[in-house]
Amino acid sequence: MNAYVRDSESVYSESYPPENFISNEPEKSKDKDNFNGEEVISYVGEVETVPAKEENVFRRFINGFKIEKNQQDSAGQGLKRRLKSRHIQMIGIGGAIGTGVWVGSSKSLYRGGAASVLIDYCIVGTMVFCTVYALGELAVAFPTRGSFVTHATRFIDESWGFALSWNYVFSFIVTIPLELTTGTMMIKYWTNLNSGIWVTVFIVFLFFINIFGVKGYGEMEFIMSTIKVVAMCGFIILGIIIDCGGVPTDHRGYMGTHIFRENAFRHKFKGFCAVFTSAAFSFSGTEYVGVAAAETENPAKAFPVAVRQTLFRIAIFYILSLFIVSLLISGADPRLTSYHGVDASPFVLAIKDANIKALPSILNAIILISVISSANAQLYAGSRAIHSLGCNGFAPKCFTLVDREGRPLVALLILFLFMFLGYLVETGQYDTVFDWMLSISGLGTLFCWGSICLAHIRYRAAMKHQNRSLKEVGFVSPFNVYASYYAFILVCLVLAAEFYVSIFPVGGKPDASAFFENYLSAPVILVFFICHKLYYKTKRITLSNMDLETDFAYKTPVEEEEEEEKSAGSLSIKQRMKKLSDMMC
């Protein structure tokens, strides 16, 4: 009688003591896991090591695309936990620096003026800060596929989860090819080569990144986010030098706050509301870090650090950078709206006005990297959103198919097919087409943020109602549930401001077409919610029947020990400095 002990390299046949032997005949066994049904022969009384069948790199690559047979993990549904803490931190930072701040800030500055930009971005920044903390607590407690759309389904309402999921997916279907067309506009800064060629290059590049699965996405995002962070810090330093008159080629001398004080509040209350909504859309993408929960090696360790850095990211990369640029470019500058693409970026205009020749081209390259990074992040988040549709029963089961490397194949294929919409850049009216397509899900980010806050509020209420302790959770928001109430109210105010500006646009008359372009997604998501509610007759989720057990990640003994050390005040100076560093950067 033999006992088989497996490891990754071989199968060992270990005999029992001689007195238990019955015969010396060879025994045969089939190990289907490691040998694909090949017979492993071992003789009683002997120990034989059978080397595992080695695969070359090419065969291993091909086999990686085979469908994962065992996808019973309810949390990940076949997704692989291969993202490290450094990936999560840089994904969070990368989501904060995109075209919204580089280029989109031009419209904000023109509509509302420097003071409105500063005030509105501070207000919306606090809203995002509170939302990310709520998301971090939910992601650590339930590190499941779908992240906040799954949380909305479980803690708010199944029909709302259905409507939110599809609205979120629609946004990626449109914005990814839109990012590709934006990238072609960046390249036109250097050459007028056919835009369709560059769309093809971008599609091939994104395909190449995603061949390597979630780890490839994480590494590429880490590299591109690092470049964006360095570039933003470099501009802040350069902006201070320009404002102080330290650039030899700039003959304007010291400027101080003179430009900032001119037209500080443009278009009065209407301008303030317009910037309020623009600021909210500029922060879109900060929720992507929550999507990665099901593919993070240690969510309980990675997410608290990434969440605590949110305040630092908002303060430096948005508030400080926009304050610096508003010292250099007036909100009344006609170039902010008469120019297009990167030429309208206040960051580029500030460098051009200082007569620094090479830097505008370098900054354009940085913005191009931001566009590619944004498309890469949206492809990742969008494919996981489509995958979660199938997992939650909101779409065909084929949407859940994942290969051995953890790639959601069908979800990625769907998004790659819609990328071909990027070739609309060859038509004359492509921007009009995208505007109407984007209107279907234009408010999706706000609905997501509001759902995160509401899900957190109801989750906390259910924990209290079911007599569950927050000590079971690996990470808890230090602001309790009050921060989620604050953020939820602000989301409602942003939606109201967008409604007001859509009816009474800045610098124009009321227009039905403009209104539906900006606000069509609100009635669309309500129609999805009502139709699903009526057809499936879903029941209301009460605090008593809310599921707090499935996929719940209990705090580990190691985390409990660390918590006890903190409460006992036994942290060393080195540990305290590390904690302060984690909170700030």
UniProtKB/Swiss-Prot annotation:
It comes from Schizosaccharomyces pombe (strain 972 / ATCC 24843). Residues 10-19 have a biased composition (Low complexity). The chain crosses the membrane at residues 90-110, 122-142, 160-180, 194-214, 222-242, 272-292, 314-334, 362-382, 408-428, 437-457, 487-507, 512-532. Residues 1-89, 143-159, 215-221, 293-313, 383-407, 458-486, 533-585 are cytoplasmic. One of its GO terms (molecular function) is amino acid transmembrane transporter activity. This is Uncharacterized amino-acid permease PB2B2.01. It is a multi-pass membrane protein. Residues 25-34 have a biased composition (Basic and acidic residues). It is found in: Endoplasmic reticulum; Membrane. Residues 111-121, 181-193, 243-271, 335-361, 429-436, 508-511 are extracellular. The lineage of its organism: Eukaryota, Fungi, Dikarya, Ascomycota, Taphrinomycotina. Keywords: Amino-acid transport, Endoplasmic reticulum, Membrane, Transmembrane, Transmembrane helix, Transport. The keyword Endoplasmic reticulum applies. GO terms for biological process: amino acid transmembrane transport. InterPro entries: AA-permease/SLC12A_dom (IPR004841), Amino_acid_permease_CS (IPR004840), APC_YAT (IPR050524). It holds the Pfam family AA_permease. Residues 1-34 are annotated as: Disordered. Belongs to the amino acid-polyamine-organocation (APC) superfamily. One of its GO terms (cellular component) is membrane.
